[in-house]
Amino acid sequence: MTNSNRIKLTWISFLSYALTGALVIVTGMVMGNIADYFHLPVSSMSNTFTFLNAGILISIFLNAWLMEIVPLKTQLRFGFILMVLAVAGLMFSHSLALFSAAMFVLGLVSGITMSIGTFLITQLYEGRQRGSRLLFTDSFFSMAGMIFPMVAAFLLARSIEWYWVYACIGLVYLAIFILTFGCEFPALGKHAQHSQAPVVKEKWGIGVLFLAVAALCYILGQLGFISWVPEYAKGLGMSLNDAGALVSDFWMSYMFGMWAFSFILRFFDLQRILTVLAGMAAVLMYLFITGTQAHMPWFILTLGFFSSAIYTSIITLGSQQTKVASPKLVNFILTCGTIGTMLTFVVTGPIVAHSGPQAALLTANGLYAVVFVMCFALGFVSRHRQHSAPATH
């Protein structure tokens, strides 16, 4: 593979995470405007965004098999057509049913693209380099989470309709579409060149189960926490701007943490540093929930920084549980993480209704504690040391 081809594929991976980050994180910014557009209360409008999460979940789950049937380049190009149709549907329809369908299609497209992006990184890089590259790739999720809410705020403040925010997000996919030209993708399944040697199917091992549970609990805990921080802060008497600043601080430090750890992780055993980071994140979240208002910004900044490497490290460790990185295994862990996204409001909504936002934050804290336990237990069964040692760069 030529160096220019590798660079193009790496950039496709970066942008695939940016696309999903933009779609997921911008929701909170536009939800009120969309509710007004359809003359609905915000509470019932939030339920329609479940279609976006459902699309992401289904596509990541199915793409473990779809990758071996449909070439990756074909999937990305077809995804561009679907993206254009979905954005057009948002622009020209006043039907809530069509809005929900468009959101589902956007979820499908971003889920397929993100699973391809993750797989490309696991194919292009090995050993500890794979972990640092995946982490840098995941930082584009947070970067989009910082940039697109600002874009949304800029457009909405000028009374420009909310659907232009999604048109701007579509430009990310346009860049992916352009990069597919003159670019060779790894072939899988029936499209791959098969050697004479029979392919030995590797067993995943119990470590994959620990990682899958950790992925689900981490994403559910993270989104459950960050979704209710503004309400919790407002309940303490903070202004809407100050409450929003806490969320921005979290994602900003999360992004800087990813950049820092993409360098730091190369020097440590991944399972050990993951266990330390999971433990620190659980403690920092508890300090944020129980601390004073004056200390909350500092706790959320450090929480964002030290938790930034957790999810990507879980995926990297999963890919290292077999000698050859398995797209099915990587997609299985991604699917578990996406189930966490789907369950966010299903789990935290009733808790908030019954006991208030602080109870939801404490639940998220408990989920982070489960992540720590899973990562600690993984140390006794993980195969990453025997598989990554020869491949370390």
Curated annotation (Swiss-Prot):
Membrane-topology descriptor: Multi-pass membrane protein
* Top-rank lineage group of the source organism: Bacteria
Q: Fetch the Gene3D superfamilies from UniProt.
A: MFS general substrate transporter like domains
What is the protein named?
Protein TsgA
Its annotated compartments are: Cell inner membrane
The record's annotation in Pfam families points to:
MFS_1
Provide the leader sequence positions: none
| Gene designation | tsgA
What is the species listed in this Swiss-Prot or TrEMBL entry?
Salmonella heidelberg (strain SL476)
Recorded family membership: Belongs to the major facilitator superfamily. TsgA family.
The answer to whether the entry has keyword DNA-binding is no
What phylogenetic lineage does the species belong to?
Bacteria, Pseudomonadati, Pseudomonadota, Gammaproteobacteria, Enterobacterales
Which GO cellular component does the record give, naming just one? plasma membrane
- UniProt KW keywords: Cell inner membrane, Cell membrane, Membrane, Transmembrane, Transmembrane helix
Q: Which residues cross the membrane?
A: 11-31, 51-71, 78-98, 101-121, 134-154, 162-182, 206-226, 245-265, 273-293, 298-318, 332-352, 361-381
